[in-house]
């Protein structure tokens, strides 16, 4: 069996993270994971990258966790993927996978894009988009009980390790009977963990295309 983390933050990109990508990878290997997606906060979230930078420089710096992590990932036979976590208003966020940093680099208009545009562009390159931790109730989130429009995205992060149980339970209760992909992710920001959420598969995932295909075909089990 192979286990993959779908929600990981690192110090290179997220202001709230404390561990570097190399150390995060080593810890995931230690607990038996086969791979992870780097999903640092982008410019409408808690990023540590200056939003005033020219687009090319912004993307270069934002992508450092992924580019820096590939060497150690290769050495440890760990499958590392690029992704994002981005805000779409009122403190709410989405996760996206299935593309390389060049996807962002070639689309400077995404600096001011709304959720619909993001979804259209992600789907145009065969990517996957999901609501992150729906129904999370925090001071910075406006109207946490609002049910998001599921028709825009491919799935939801139904199990988030950083959520309260009641928040995850509501996500499963609301969306469990919908035709949407339900994933799991840890939302970890440091190496201070000895277990993690994710997906478990019977096959190894080696490419963006395989990751998206696995998710869309629901060819996995959530791992908690």
What label would you give each PLM region?
Residues 42-157, 162-163, 214-216, 220:
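Extended substrate/RNA-proximal surfaces in nucleic-acid metabolism proteins
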Residues 10-11, 34-47:
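Ser/Thr-glycine-rich phosphate-binding loops at phosphate-binding pockets of nucleotides
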Residues 1-14, 20-26, 90-102, 120, ...:
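Charged catalytic cores and adjacent phosphate/nucleic-acid-binding surfaces used
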Residues 37, 81, 130, 181-183:
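Structural detector of well-ordered beta-strand residues that form the stable sheet scaffold
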Residues 18, 59-63, 205:
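Short, conserved loop/turn and helix-capping segments at secondary-structure boundaries
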Residues 23-39:
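Catalytic domains of carbohydrate-active enzymes, especially glycoside hydrolases
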Residues 2-4, 35, 128:
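Structural motif
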Residues 33, 78, 177-180:
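A short helix->loop->beta-strand "cap" motif at the edges of active sites that frequently abuts
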């Amino acid at each position: 069996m192979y286990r993959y983390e779908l929600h990981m933050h690192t110090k290179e990109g997220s202001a709230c993270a404390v561990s570097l990508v190399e150390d995060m990878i080593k810890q995931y290997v230690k607990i038996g994971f086969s791979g992870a997606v780097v999903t640092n906060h982008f410019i409408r979230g808690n990023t540590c990258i200056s939003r005033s930078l020219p687009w090319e420089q912004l993307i270069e710096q934002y992508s450092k966790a992924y580019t820096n992590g590939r060497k150690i990932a290769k050495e440890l036979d760990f499958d590392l993927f690029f992704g994002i976590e981005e805000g779409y208003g009122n403190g709410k966020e989405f996760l996206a996978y299935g593309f390389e940093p060049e996807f962002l680099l070639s689309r400077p208009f995404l600096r001011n894009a709304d959720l619909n545009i993001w979804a259209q562009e992600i789907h145009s390159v065969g990517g996957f988009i999901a609501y992150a931790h729906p129904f999370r109730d925090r001071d910075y989130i406006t109207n946490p009980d609002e049910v998001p429009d599921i028709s825009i995205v491919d799935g939801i992060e139904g199990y988030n390790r950083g959520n309260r149980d009641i928040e995850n339970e509501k996500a499963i209760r609301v969306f469990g009977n919908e035709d949407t992909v339900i994933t799991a992710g840890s939302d970890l920001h440091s190496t201070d963990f000895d277990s993690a959420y994710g997906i478990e598969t019977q096959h190894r995932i080696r490419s963006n295309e395989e990751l998206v295909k696995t998710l869309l075909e629901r060819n996995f089990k959530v791992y908690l």
